[in-house]
Structures are given as C-alpha cells and as structure tokens.
C-alpha cells in the first residue's frame, strides 16, 4: 500500500501554534464510522455525546523536559539531545543533532556542565545510546536544565511556567518525549461531569517515544518499521475493560497511544485485554482488524503519518480524508495544540 495515499494538502495557517483556553473549548468533529455523518461540536459537549456506561480509557503518562542543549566537548559545536527511552545504568536511547559529529566515544556537556553525555553507540533508527555522568538526582537535574520537547511544527517555545499546558490534567508517571495530545482537551471539571453522567474512566500507560512520532520515510506502508515503546495495563484497567466488553458497553480510546496499547494487549491474549506490561511496536494501518476499541478520540494528524494511518484503519481512509477536508474548510486547528475528533 502506497504511503502517498495518506497525503493531503495542509495550509501552514491550519497548524495550531498555541493551545486553546480553556482546554475543553477546542472544537470537536464527531465522525460516525457506519454512515460517514459528521457533526461539529465543542469538546466539552462530550458529556452529552457519549452514553452512560461508555468506558473512556486515557493514557496517564507524563512528558519529561526531554530536550537538552549543550556543546560537544572541546569544541564550539552546539548539540541537541532528546531523551527517548531509559535503558538502565544511566544509559538512555536518544535523538541527537547534528548526528554526523557525534560518534561513539564523544562527550557532550549539557546544562552548563552539570550533565555529561557519553556517546556509546549508534542505534538502528539513527539515534544514539548515551551514558550520562552527573551528581545528585537525575530527574531533578533534567527538570532544571531540560525543555519541553515540542514538535518542530510548533515554532514558539512554551515558557517554563506554562509547561503544564503540554501535560494532560491526569498525567502521573514520567517517561514520555511527547504528549498524548488527545488528552490535552480534558479539564478536571469535564472529567467530573463525565463521571456524574455514568461514563466510566480508567487509565493505561504508554510512554510516547519515537514509535509515535517518527516520520514514515519509505514509499510503501508495509516497509515502515515502528520503534518500540513501553506500555502497561494494570489489573484495575483490565477488569474495567473486560467488564465493559462483557456487558456490551463501548470502550473508547482517548488517543492513538491508548488504541495501540489496548490492541497490543488484546493481541497477546486472543482478543482479551489482560493486565501486563512490555514493549509494543504495533503498526496499525488499513486492513487491521480491531479487537478492543469501539471509539477513538484523537487530534488531526500529519500527512503521511502512522497516526493518520491508524485513524484510517479505524474509520476508513476515504472517509477520514473527506472529514479532514471538511475540517480545513471550516477552520479547524490541526496537530498537537489543535482541535479533536471523536470517531464512533
């Protein structure tokens, strides 16, 4: 299947540069999979759109200030490092720039010398494995010297005092290099209103890394390889999902990361989501048969991206691209700080 089938024209002005305030004032396109019908709402209307008994599943991951800047030791070369995955023993898988100058054995001094990164090896995905050298607590140090890893299409840095705007209000466990952006639209009040209406909410964990945002650089979808990301389904979530499925209630994934987590877990246990953790490199594109989710809340995604392919697998490529065209005509805002879709 050609990657070009998932391309579309996107004017630069449609890319949201700042988030809407309040969070739940963003727009919400509702797409009905069976008929292709589209409705235009506000995100806080979700409380009136979902049914009592629906189960919302959110991703409780928390973004770390994973973007670090420094100098290649004994030179004036500026280096950017983005933390991806901890590997133990102070080693991390990272992205680096400029890559060609950072070979094994090279040191990079970060945070005015408070942290040193030793390049250990080059990875299959063009990143690096580094070993960090430092004093004190690593997480505290990263919080002090790191920056939020906003996507490159967001051209204005988020002030440190506004860093929470790139976190979901229910984020708990540190580990992501990007936000699970579908969840950015929820407020504490909206979550409370949903619960009062009889809509159940549970959480799983997927630490967002290269697998979620790595561009597709091949011509055929089948040739793209996903990067592994850590996921976890705890017993409470597994029980809630199993009960909903047994009772014929809808399971609605808040974001593609939740969809990939639940479909991974279901694939390991003959269609049943069981408690457990591990690494997933699941790549969902048209032709995939969903085993768990009945609905999906998601943002509007980049052309030719694996996220757009996942959404197309769930709702149909032509139907999704038609909805995207309508969204552009009606002035919806795209990507991480943009508006949302509910696909049911």
UniProtKB/Swiss-Prot annotation:
Catalysed reactions, as listed in the record: 7-aminomethyl-7-carbaguanosine(34) in tRNA + S-adenosyl-L-methionine = epoxyqueuosine(34) in tRNA + adenine + L-methionine + 2 H(+)
Domain of life: Bacteria
GO biological process, one term: tRNA wobble guanine modification
Entries under SUPFAM superfamilies matching the protein: QueA-like
Principal location listed in the UniProt entry: cytoplasm
An MF annotation (GO) of this entry: S-adenosylmethionine:tRNA ribosyltransferase-isomerase activity
GO cellular component: cytoplasm
Key word Signal present: no
Coiled coil: none
Subcellular compartments: Cytoplasm
Pathway entry: tRNA modification; tRNA-queuosine biosynthesis
PANTHER family: S-ADENOSYLMETHIONINE:TRNA RIBOSYLTRANSFERASE-ISOMERASE
Summary of the function given for this chain in its UniProt record: Transfers and isomerizes the ribose moiety from AdoMet to the 7-aminomethyl group of 7-deazaguanine (preQ1-tRNA) to give epoxyqueuosine (oQ-tRNA).
Family affiliation: Belongs to the QueA family.
Listed NCBIfam families: PRK00147.1, queA
Subunit annotation: Monomer.
Protein name (record): S-adenosylmethionine:tRNA ribosyltransferase-isomerase
Organism, scientific name: Heliobacterium modesticaldum (strain ATCC 51547 / Ice1)
Gene behind this protein: queA
